[in-house]
């Protein structure tokens, strides 16, 4: 397997790679504006990773509630609140705190989520939908996207905004730390269904896995305790998909600080996901037939940078453009 150059306006250099030892990205684009000074977003919080709060509902009761019907769950919750009268003042105080936080400094009204969504849709309809009748007319007939994109659920890294994808251009899957698990028909059927639909039915030509800076999921992966203990119901088990990336980074970057190791793992975890894509038979078939290409990317929203690298599988040598 060789690292292929990306046929785009990016600066390209040839490189060789293997799934066991992925190389550094071979394409780089700096998306910065020297005329503006962009500060680091104030919402980035440096808090403990996967720190589970003390549960109001004990783990055994939580598991039992997960198996209940909607009506049973409501009844159980009402019973819990009636038995734990001390929760009332706590809940009221928390509501007051949230309300105070949502008040802006100029004393305007609290944030209204319904009004926010209504205003957002009105803007979309008047500024985009009604101004592009040809586009949305075609989309009403079906979709034929060129890209399938795996991106993180992080609210700061929407791929449609970052890469300016228009409606109908990208079939997007978002999850914690933009992970792609290996083929598993029972454990990760949701991801498998998305890949199968994109490759076999939508006939996408590119699958792109995009990591990003300051990823909490990757920080959590790098912080997993060595004894295997867990404090969450789902998150830690999910990010363990990237354990090969963690092991590689800790082995090759032992002299680096934790923050730099996390940055390296953000990119290495993308390579692990690209490798996992090869465990899907229809992905391998697409690569052999050259109807499908795999690409990895990393979006640095702190510095305004984007790296892109490609993988090509076959007998032909890689090319540089």
From Swiss-Prot:
Cellular component, GO annotation: chloroplast stroma
Pfam families: Pro_CA
Keyword presence, Chloroplast: yes
A molecular function (GO) term: zinc ion binding
Catalyzed reactions per annotation: hydrogencarbonate + H(+) = CO2 + H2O
Keywords associated with the record: Chloroplast, Lyase, Plastid, Transit peptide, Zinc
Entry EC number(s): 4.2.1.1
UniProt cross-references to Gene3D superfamilies, sorted A to Z: Carbonic anhydrase
InterPro entries: Beta_CA_cladeB, Carbonic_anhydrase, Carbonic_anhydrase_CS, Carbonic_anhydrase_sf
Gene Ontology terms: biological process: carbon utilization
Transit peptide, UniProt annotation: 1-100
Family the UniProt entry places it in: Belongs to the beta-class carbonic anhydrase family.
Assembly mode: Homohexamer.
Name of the protein this chain belongs to: Carbonic anhydrase, chloroplastic
Organism field: Nicotiana tabacum
């Amino acid at each position: 397997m060789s690292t292929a150059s990306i046929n785009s306006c990016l600066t390209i250099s040839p490189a060789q790679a293997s799934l066991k030892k992925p190389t550094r990205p071979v394409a780089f684009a700096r998306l910065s504006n020297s005329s503006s000074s962009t500060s680091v977003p104030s919402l980035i919080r440096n808090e403990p990773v996967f720190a589970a709060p003390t549960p109001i509902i004990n783990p055994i009761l939580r598991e039992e509630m997960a198996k209940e019907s909607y009506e049973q769950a409501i009844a159980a919750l009402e019973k819990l609140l009636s038995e734990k009268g001390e929760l009332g003042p706590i809940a009221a105080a928390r509501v007051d705190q949230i309300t105070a936080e949502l008040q802006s400094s100029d004393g305007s009204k609290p944030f209204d989520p319904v009004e926010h969504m209504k205003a957002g849709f009105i803007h979309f309809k008047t500024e985009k939908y009604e101004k592009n009748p040809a586009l949305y007319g075609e989309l009403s007939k079906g979709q034929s996207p060129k890209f399938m994109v795996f991106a993180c659920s992080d609210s700061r890294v929407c791929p449609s905004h970052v890469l300016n994808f228009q409606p109908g251009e990208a079939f997007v899957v978002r999850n914690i730390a933009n992970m792609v698990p290996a083929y598993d028909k029972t454990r990760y059927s949701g991801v498998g269904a998305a890949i199968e639909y994109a490759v076999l039915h939508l006939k996408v030509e590119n699958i792109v896995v995009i990591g990003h800076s300051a990823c909490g999921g990757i920080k959590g992966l790098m912080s997993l305790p060595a004894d295997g203990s867990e404090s969450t119901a789902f998150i830690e088990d999910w990010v363990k998909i990237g354990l090969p990336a963690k092991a590689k980074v800790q082995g090759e970057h032992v002299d680096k600080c934790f923050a730099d190791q996390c940055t390296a793992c953000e990119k290495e975890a993308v390579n692990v996901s690209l490798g996992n894509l090869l465990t899907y038979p229809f992905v391998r078939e697409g690569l052999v037939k050259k109807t499908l290409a795999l690409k990895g990317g990393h979006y640095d929203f702190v510095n305004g940078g984007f790296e892109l690298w490609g993988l090509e599988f076959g007998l032909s040598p890689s090319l540089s453009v």
